[in-house]
Curated annotation (Swiss-Prot):
This is 2-C-methyl-D-erythritol 2,4-cyclodiphosphate synthase. Keywords: Isoprene biosynthesis, Lyase, Metal-binding. One of its GO terms (molecular function) is metal ion binding. HAMAP family: IspF. Its EC number is 4.6.1.12. The record marks H38, T137 as: Transition state stabilizer. Binds 1 divalent metal cation per subunit. The gene is ispF. It comes from Bordetella avium (strain 197N). Belongs to the IspF family.
Length: 162
């Protein structure tokens, strides 16, 4: 039986540290802290990448772009997302939609969401109205509420290519 649709879920979290730029959804945001990681540590794009790879049955971001590989040191996560999308496409899938939540006590994500939507839509080759980004604080609770990190969760739907 051929299944015409697949759902993928992605999650990522990175610690906030001084001395690094803050890049979320491919958008550089002015902030006192940035995200720590091997690449540019774009928590949102990493979660999107995991969601599309997972839905296509292709594993996760670590399988394709391991943080032990020096080629990905400081890598632009938009480049990684486009490469992951090429692999999803080669496997016969297309993205139907992306629904994402960025979990951050600070900074405010809302003002940057339209640019993030535009980046993700462009990198996945889909219309802007097929990408949704929400922002949530942790109401001061836990490591996110203490502003020690930022997390992202993503759900995506893929359809078999016609």
């Amino acid at each position: 039986m051929t299944i015409p649709f697949r759902v993928g879920q992605g999650f990522d979290v990175h610690a906030l540290v001084t001395g690094r730029p803050l890049i979320i959804g491919g958008v550089r945001i002015e902030h006192s802290h940035g995200l720590l990681g091997h690449s540019d540590a774009d928590v949102l794009l990493h979660a999107v990448t995991d969601a599309i790879l997972g839905a296509a049955g292709l594993g996760d971001i670590g399988r394709h772009f391991p943080d032990t590989d020096p080629r990905f040191k400081g890598a632009d996560s938009r480049v990684l997302l486009r490469e992951a999308m090429a692999r999803v496409d080669a496997a016969g899938w297309q993205v139907v939609n992306v629904d994402a939540t960025v979990h951050a006590q600070a900074p405010k994500i809302g003002p940057h969401a339209p640019a993030m939507v535009a980046n993700i839509a462009a990198d996945l080759g889909i219309a802007h109205d097929l990408v949704n980004i929400k922002a949530k604080t942790n109401e001061g609770l836990g490591y996110l509420g203490r502003k020690e990190g930022i997390a992202a969760t993503v759900v995506t739907l893929l359809a078999r290519q016609a």
